[in-house]
Each structure stands twice: as structure tokens, then as C-alpha cells.
């Protein structure tokens, strides 16, 4: 006997989920834009990042059935966490990280894919121009190449280094032209600045609320995937295991350097969105339907709280 579809199942399989989510998100952005000036550049980056998530889902078949939950989850979480206090730096870093994922999986099981590796890590290099601390992810990304994309070799290792450095060739020219070599030196000094570890003096209630909710989604999505991933192809499992590893790394880095919670939070959302989308798409039953509805209500309430209630520094 066919099981009756729940609200969760209908949303997950609907072709209208992404258009409706995009419309609602746009209305929220426009409403906030009437109150807060200069948010449209960030809105444009969020829209482009969402399109990249659509492409990431399509190209890598993240869902073994039709579903737009990856891009819907990403857009909903970015709208919730980003408004009304937007960060252009965070928006750019987030888009670059998605672009990295989109490119690096072309290297799957190909240890001679120096070209794709170069382009993927050039995206990380671009992100590091404005957020040098993303360099802390480099060892983890190399582990990813060894264990998950199975593309690590001496050639691809050096290709990743060259890709990371290339944006600085152009940036160095700019700093020389403007006679601001000290600015370039200060940029790299931030990479080894450990004086602000565990500095929670500027963390706000909004940031803690957003992080707690996204972490909850990460845990739910990760546990569900680990328990039920046997139905997926090996390549798909590798991709999701990468999401789990990078989510854990992002949370650890946020705990260590909470002053970078916006930039790291964007990276966390990129990795969490597919995990919770997998949960929404492939779970059945009344309990998971109720869980989905509760998570949806929590997201709306947190979004309303972020927009309507002024931020408060906790310490």
C-alpha cells in the first residue's frame, strides 16, 4: 500500500519549492532593504551563490531523486543568518567556497587533474585576499583530496599551491603600485595572529542563535546521512563525508576564533545545507514531518528575531 505523502515529502519533491523559496527570500530582502541601506551587493552575491548551489547539486547528483532542497536550504539559511547585519566579506568568501566545491569534484579519482585543482584552489586564493584565515582550511582540503576526491599527488599538491598564490601576484602589483607594501605584510600577519583566540567579547545574541540552529541542522543531517547513506553511490558518499568534515572544522574554527563567525558561518552553511536537505528529502513518517515543520518554524522565528530585535553583545 502506498504511503500518503506528508507535507515534508511534498515540499522536498515539488518543482515549485525553489521558486517559492526564492520569491519569499527576495521579499524579505526587499523589506529589509527598505530599512537598511546598501544591502543589494550582498543580495546579488547571495543570489549568485544560490545558483552555484543549484549547479553543484545538478552536476554531482547530490540527491538520487528530484529535489531542490539543497539550494532551498542554502538560501533560507543565508537569509536567516545574513539579515539585517550583512557582511560583504562573508558573501564573497561563501561564493568562493561553493565555486571551489563545484570545480574540485571534477578531479575525482584523477591524480593528474592539475588544471582543475589549480582553478579550484584559485577560488580559495581569491577568498583569502579578503579573509586570510581561510588558509587554515588548506590542510583539511588536502586531506579531502587524499581521502575523498582521491586526486592527491605531487603534481596536484603543487597545482593547489600555485592556485592559492596566483591571486596574490595581482594583489602584490596593486600594493606596489599604491606604495602600500605594509598593507600586504599586515594582511599576512593576520594569518598568524593568535592573540584573539577564544575572544568572545564581540559575539552577539544573534550570532549565537544562528550558530546554534545551524549546528543543530548539521548534527541532524550528519547523523541521518551516516545511518542511511548505503543507498548512494560511492562518489556521492565521498561528497557528503566532505561536507561533514568541513562542517566540523568550521564549527571548531568558530569556537577558536569567534570574531570571524560571519565568514566561517557562511562556510558552515555551504556544508550544512546539503546535509539537512538530504534529511528532508529522504526521511518519511509523522515524526520527521513534525521535525521538519518545527525546524521551519524555528527558522522563521530566528529570522524575525534577527530582523526585529537589536543585537546585544553577550559579554
Predicted regions and their residues:
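Aromatic- and kink-enriched transmembrane "portal" helix at the membrane-lumen/periplasm boundary
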Residues: 34-35, 72-91
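Juxtamembrane membrane-water interface segments that cap and precede transmembrane helices
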Residues: 23-30, 185-208, 221-225
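Perimembrane helix-loop-helix junctions
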Residues: 137-162
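Membrane-interface transmembrane helices that cradle and orient dolichyl/undecaprenyl
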Residues: 100-115
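Transmembrane alpha-helical segments
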Residues: 49-57, 96-104, 218, 272-284
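Transmembrane-helix signature of polytopic, membrane-embedded enzymes
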Residues: 59-77
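Membrane-water interface signatures at transmembrane helix termini and the short loops
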Residues: 223-284
Amino acid at each position: 500500500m502506498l504511503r500518503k505523502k506528508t507535507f515534508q515529502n511534498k515540499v522536498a519533491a515539488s518543482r515549485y519549492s525553489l521558486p517559492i523559496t526564492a520569491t519569499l527570500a527576495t521579499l524579505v530582502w526587499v523589506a529589509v532593504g527598505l530599512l537598511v541601506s546598501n544591502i543589494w551587493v550582498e543580495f546579488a552575491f547571495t543570489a549568485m551563490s544560490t545558483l552555484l548551489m543549484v549547479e553543484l547539486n545538478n552536476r554531482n547528483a547530490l540527491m538520487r531523486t528530484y529535489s531542490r532542497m539543497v539550494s532551498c536550504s542554502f538560501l533560507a539559511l543565508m537569509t536567516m543568518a545574513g539579515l539585517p547585519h550583512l557582511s560583504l566579506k562573508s558573501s564573497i568568501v561563501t561564493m568562493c567556497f561553493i565555486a571551489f566545491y563545484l570545480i574540485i569534484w571534477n578531479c575525482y579519482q584523477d591524480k593528474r587533474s592539475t588544471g582543475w585543482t589549480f582553478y579550484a584552489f584559485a577560488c580559495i586564493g581569491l577568498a583569502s585576499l579578503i579573509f586570510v584565515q581561510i588558509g587554515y582550511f588548506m590542510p583539511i582540503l588536502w586531506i579531502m583530496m587524499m581521502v575523498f576526491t582521491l586526486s592527491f599527488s605531487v603534481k596536484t599538491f603543487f597545482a593547489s599551491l600555485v592556485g592559492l598564490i596566483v591571486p596574490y601576484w595581482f594583489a602584490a602589483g596593486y600594493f606596489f603600485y599604491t606604495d602600500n607594501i605594509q598593507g600586504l605584510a599586515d594582511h599576512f600577519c593576520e594569518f598568524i595572529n593568535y592573540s584573539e583566540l577564544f575572544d568572545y567579547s564581540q559575539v552577539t545574541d544573534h550570532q549565537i542563535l544562528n550558530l546554534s540552529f545551524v549546528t543543530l541542522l548539521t548534527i541532524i543531517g550528519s547523523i541521518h546521512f551516516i545511518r542511511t547513506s548505503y543507498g548512494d553511490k560511492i562518489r556521492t558518499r565521498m561528497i557528503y563525508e566532505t561536507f561533514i568534515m568541513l562542517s566540523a572544522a568550521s564549527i571548531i574554527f568558530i569556537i577558536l576564533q569567534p570574531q570571524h563567525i560571519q565568514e566561517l558561518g557562511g562556510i558552515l552553511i555551504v556544508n550544512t545545507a546539503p546535509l539537512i536537505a538530504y534529511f528532508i528529502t529522504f526521511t518519511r513518517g509523522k515524526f520527521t514531518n513534525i521535525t521538519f515543520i518545527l525546524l521551519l518554524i524555528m527558522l522563521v522565528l530566528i529570522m524575525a528575531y534577527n530582523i526585529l530585535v537589536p543585537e546585544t553583545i553577550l559579554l
